[in-house]
Amino acid sequence: MTTNGNHKQERAGLTRPRRLLLCLDGVPFDIVREARERGLFEGWNEPTRLLSPFPTMTNIALSAMLRATAPLGYESLYFDRNSREIRGGIGKYIGRRTPDKLPSSYMDELDYQEPLPFEFLVYVAPEAVWRADMRRFREQFRNAPQRRDYFAFLKGTDGLLHIRGAEPLRRALESLDRLLKEIRAWCGAETEITLFSDHGMTIGEIRRVHLQTHLRRCGYEIVDRLNGRAGGRGVALPAFGLIGYAALFCNEENKGKLAEDLTELEGVDFSIYRDAADAITVKGAEGSARIHRREEDGRISYRYEQVAGDPLRLTEALCGLSDEGLLDDEGYASAKSWSARTATHIYPDALANLYNALNTERVHHTADLLVNLKDGYYYGSSLFAHIVSLKATHGNALRASSTAFMMSTHRALPEFVRADEARPLLKD
């Protein structure tokens, strides 16, 4: 039986088929669509775009998709807004997977995940982790009770893309296809298989953004702890995984100037910060804009106010909404209209996604400023950068990283699914 708060309960095998739910970490929609064109996953329904929330990171995405508790921070090294200091780090990956190391309640729902040390080793020896994961998953699934759903999470795919690139992932999907054919033959039509991913990936040459160096040149002090002094130039920015965004924490009065200073740095696309109860500012080299949100009678709408230029490249979408009569007198259009118009945009579902990144609890300790990096750039730990050579990464709000996938053996899915609308299709 599955249940989630007020959501309806269903009994696997009685009101719907038993479900094998399999999450593949970091697999982009485009690679799965290409795999289908090569003849893999024959007999499945077409994959749909699953829009991952910004920053496009595993725990943020899965907590949204499964309506679970939010993680403390964007990564295991995070800034604690209560103590005003950076906490956490590599200790999460040492020892056993104890309750204090679980980032979100979605992990309580997993029937299979790799042993804790493999969460780090997957970025050192991804092929070995993938093969071991496949063997353990196959054995544990075959031994699981056949009258309930089974939820597995395979992280090897993320490591393969990060460290090896697209071709090893294509081969991994071939081996997965063979295994799933075996499972389908064994389980029959009584078991639905639903494949999905948490986020996509930007594949290609990845260069470091020299964020801390630039901020120091601009007169800021990089700190682990903020003392709260008015006018202080301290900036805390945790550096952990090699990813396509950065989370900055600073004094309230410095946000606008900080975002302005970052427009000059190579690799920075734009920054976002809250500037009102119902609006955020987007500021980048292409200009600045504000995203306004309005809720009336349970209906949510957004307005894109171009202050200077068009940092989100939404002029065409805005004109289309206007031509179709979907903008009201104040320039607002419904959230559904914006989503439908921008689901495949360079910044998928940009208005809701970016606004909610700062105004909903995607993490407990929300940043003062979120920096979106251009495709091909990363920020993170210098130590990790010396250990691995990146072939791909994720984290930003651009299409490649934001577009995950969902695909079912039994159901035709909508053309696109937002992360916060995914749970009924996955678990309920």
Segments from the language model and where they lie:
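A short acidic (Asp/Glu
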Residues: 31-35, 161-166, 203-209, 382-383
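Acidic, His- and aromatic-enriched active-site or binding-groove loops in soluble protein domains
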Residues: 42-47, 72-79, 171-181, 211-230
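Metal-dependent active-site segment of extracytoplasmic phospho-/sulfohydrolases and closely related
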Residues: 20-23, 176-211, 370
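Active-site-proximal N-terminal segment of extracellular/periplasmic enzymes that hydrolyze or transfer
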Residues: 2-49
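Short, solvent-exposed loop/turn segments at secondary-structure junctions
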Residues: 26-29, 72, 155-159, 200-202, ...
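Active-site neighborhoods of enzymes that stabilize oxyanions during catalysis
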Residues: 234-425
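His/Asp/Glu-rich, glycine-adjacent segments
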Residues: 4, 36-39, 53-175, 234-239, ...
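A short, conserved beta-to-alpha structural element at the edge of catalytic cores
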Residues: 8, 47-62, 220-236
